[in-house]
């Protein structure tokens, strides 16, 4: 009986979803929340999947309820939200910032990219005339449960 319990625990542990990046960082499954009509949200999810993360894509009627549930400050809200381990991810946060978050494990609630900056993952814009990308610099903001914010990363084209 003890052995069968051990076997069940090992089977459950082996089924836990996580990804290993090139840097060998253990990354838990991402649980994403978005509206059905959001195309840029799908592109952000593909950005994560293309970088080896497992993403559960939840279509929800009321994305604002998720933002309230995870205490995302109003001024940082964007079109989609996600949970990765104990952290909340809001908006078009790039994989590099997510990896940094999981490496450093700061005492924060999560990261956000306010608005929808051109060139952030999912917000790439291609010019038909020049076939080049139109990117802008943006900041990845860390936030705490109390609503305190600080710059976590600066992203430049």
List where the protein language model places each region.
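Hydrophobic membrane-insertion alpha-helices, especially the h-region
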Residues: 1-8
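Ser/Thr/Pro/Gly-rich low-complexity linker/stalk segments immediately outside membranes or between
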Residues: 12-26
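Local sequence-structure signature of Cys/Sec-based thiol-disulfide redox active-site neighborhoods
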Residues: 23-51
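Short active-site oxyanion
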Residues: 29-31, 53-55, 85-88
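Stable alpha-helical elements in mature extracytoplasmic
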Residues: 37, 44, 59-62, 94-98
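Short alpha-helix boundary/capping motifs
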Residues: 37-39, 57, 72
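Conserved helix-turn-beta segment immediately C-terminal to the redox Cys motif
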Residues: 45-65
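Thiol/selenol-based redox catalytic cores and closely related redox-interacting motifs
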Residues: 69-157
């Amino acid at each position: 009986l003890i052995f069968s319990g051990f076997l069940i625990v090992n089977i459950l542990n082996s089924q836990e979803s996580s990804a290993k990046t090139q840097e060998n960082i253990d990354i838990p499954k991402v649980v994403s929340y978005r509206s059905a009509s959001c195309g840029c949200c799908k592109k952000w999810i593909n950005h994560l999947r293309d970088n080896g993360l497992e993403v559960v894509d939840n279509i929800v009627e009321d994305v604002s309820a998720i933002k309230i549930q995870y205490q995302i400050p109003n001024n940082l809200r964007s079109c989609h939200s996600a949970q990765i381990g104990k952290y909340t991810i809001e908006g078009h946060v790039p994989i590099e910032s997510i990896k940094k978050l999981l490496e450093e494990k700061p005492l924060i609630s999560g990261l956000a990219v306010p608005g929808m900056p051109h060139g952030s993952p999912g917000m790439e814009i291609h010019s038909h005339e020049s076939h080049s990308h139109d990117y802008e610099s943006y900041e990845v903001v860390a936030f705490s449960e109390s609503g305190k914010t600080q710059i976590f990363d600066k992203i430049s084209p």
